Structures are given as structure tokens and as C-alpha cells.
Amino acid sequence: MDGIKYAVFTEKSIRLLGNNQYTSNVESGSTRTEIKHWVELFFGVKVIAMNSHRLPGKGRRVGPIKGHTMHYRRMIITLQPGYSIPPLIEKRT
């Protein structure tokens, strides 16, 4: 579970759930094969395809000092029909 940070819930990612595609942010140093192996092992599913893209870090400013956050990678994981991943929503109190 080292590679996957958290699941992403945006309008597009919720729409992709209908196509059996799950979206999550992963560590920027992780490879596609590592993430695929981990998802298949942990959730017991079969992965058909994985698409990834790297999102740039956002600019931040504290007084006169300018900086930016770290970039991260987002994966869209497509599963075989009949398989699904349980919801990854944490309960907030």
C-alpha cells in the first residue's frame, strides 16, 4: 500500500466508475507495473489497462518567499468486467 496515496473523487472520476475505471493519486516515483501488481494483490482483481499522467505542483507563497508543492502522478486503473474495488472513502467525524 506504499504506492497509492488516496482515491480521487471528482466529476470525471465518478463518471469513469460506470466504465469500471478507478482513479487515484500515487507516489511520483512508483512505476505502472508496481501499482498494477499491488492493486491485483491487495484487492484481488484483474487489471486490464492503466493510464497515468503527472500533474504539476501548485505555486505557494508565504510573504516574500515563493515556492511550490511537489508534483504527483494520477493513475486511472481499468478493471476487467465483473471485478470491482470497494469504496475507499474514510469516515470523517
Curated annotation (Swiss-Prot):
Keyword Plastid: yes
Localization terms from the record: Plastid, Chloroplast
Gene Ontology CC: chloroplast; ribonucleoprotein complex; ribosome
Residue ranges crossing the lipid bilayer per the database entry: none
InterPro entries the record matches: Nucleotide-bd_a/b_plait_sf, Ribosomal_uL23-like, Ribosomal_uL23/eL15/eS24_sf, Ribosomal_uL23_CS
Keywords of this entry: Chloroplast, Plastid, Ribonucleoprotein, Ribosomal protein, RNA-binding, rRNA-binding
MF-aspect GO terms: rRNA binding; structural constituent of ribosome
One Pfam family cited in the UniProt record for this chain: Ribosomal_L23
GO biological-process terms attached to the record: translation
The keyword rRNA-binding appears for this protein: yes
Gene3D superfamilies: 3.30.70.330
Coarse class of the protein's main subcellular location: plastid
PANTHER family, per the entry: 60S RIBOSOMAL PROTEIN L23A (PTHR11620)
The family this protein is said to belong to: Belongs to the universal ribosomal protein uL23 family.
Assembly and interaction partners: Part of the 50S ribosomal subunit.
Function statement: Binds to 23S rRNA.
Name by which UniProt lists this protein: Large ribosomal subunit protein uL23cz/uL23cy
